[in-house]
Amino acid sequence: MFDVTPLENLFIEEYMLRAPGDFVKVYIYGLRLCYHPVEDATVPAISRALGLEEKTVLDAFAYWERVGVLRRIADNPPAYSFFNLKEAMLTGKAEG
């Protein structure tokens, strides 16, 4: 809880400013879970933590996948890999 989750300035400038607010919440919370895993990182758990409908959480992940900042790596249950945006921009490859 007292640790840090790095949020790239590139995300803020290129993606956050155009995204719906609830989708930004999902991205930042998901990024936090990448750096500080918890036992229950399911869509229902994320939904409860953020006070959002599960559909909103799933829509948010689908949105972020479409814009290219993460990718879905499993379907049941859904799991995602977040990209290093600077590396993806410099190399032209997105790797999570």
Model regions: which residues?
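Long, low-complexity, charged/polar intrinsically disordered regions in eukaryotic proteins
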Residues: 1-14
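Winged-helix/helix-turn-helix nucleic-acid-interaction surface
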Residues: 55-96
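Detector for short helical micro-motifs
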Residues: 12-53
